[in-house]
Amino acid sequence: MVIKAQSPAGFAEEYIIESIWNNRFAPGTILPAERELSELIGVTRTTLREVLQRLARDGWLTIQHGKPTKVNNFWETSGLNILETLARLDHESVPQLIDNLLSVRTNISTIFIRTAFRQHPDKALEVLATANAIEDHADAFATLDYNIFRGLAFASGNPIYGLIINGMKGLYTRIGRHYFANPEARSLALGFYHKLSEICSEGMHDQVYETVRRYGRDSGEIWHRMQKNLPGDLAIHGH
């Protein structure tokens, strides 16, 4: 186990998460007692207690007063906020994790984009217009793309869609900085934003589904061609 965290709390958090991931602390089992665990990791019990509370909030553990702390099956109890952690823990599963993330984005955005165009077209067009003054480099496009999907999610009038996109932000923007380094990807995205603006302006709501699905397929093809050059630290740093 290689842990790069800087602070004692950060080290303890990484140690426990990696131990859960590697089944040293297996899901469904009881975590070692506080005193034993603090000595094992090399942190104070106060620090450990803070870390355990944080991990419980993220769904890794269940803490009940007067009972031992239980290790959860995090797939069933955690939220989108652990995406980056999962990518950092298991490099081999990163491509599949990213495919799943992008598939979810495509599937839910066909719904919220159409709803935004129907319910709040002016707001949707305002969001899409931000693409008109974009600088032609990867970082700018990664931010723009995230903000467009997020903006359209909130423009749908259902803030839950926006919260889902918020939960994807960390890993999504890391992918974007790599993906949008490709000029073909930037060109495809601009064409997509322009087409969406056209659809919204002309009220052609029935075209949203196929337009979004096609963009998902086309961008997916570019991404898969690029994956062999995927940097190993895509989601490792900046935890």
From Swiss-Prot:
* Keywords linked to the UniProt accession: Activator, Cytoplasm, DNA-binding, Fatty acid metabolism, Lipid metabolism, Repressor, Transcription, Transcription regulation
Q: Which InterPro entries match?
A: FA-response_TF_FadR, FadR_C, TF_FadR/GntR_C, Tscrpt_reg_HTH_GntR, WH-like_DNA-bd_sf, WH_DNA-bd_sf
Look up the signal peptide feature and give its range: none
One GO cellular component from the entry? cytoplasm
User: HTH gntR-type domain spans which residues?
Assistant: 6-74
Enumerate the transmembrane spans. Answer: none
Question: Which PROSITE patterns would you find in this protein's record?
Answer: HTH_GNTR
User: Which CDD domains does the protein's record reference?
Assistant: WHTH_GntR
DNA-binding region listed in the record: 34-53
Q: What is its main location?
A: cytoplasm
Compartment(s) of residence: Cytoplasm
Please give the subunit comment from the record: Homodimer.
Name the UniProt record assigns to this protein: Fatty acid metabolism regulator protein
- The protein's organism comes out as Enterobacter sp. (strain 638)
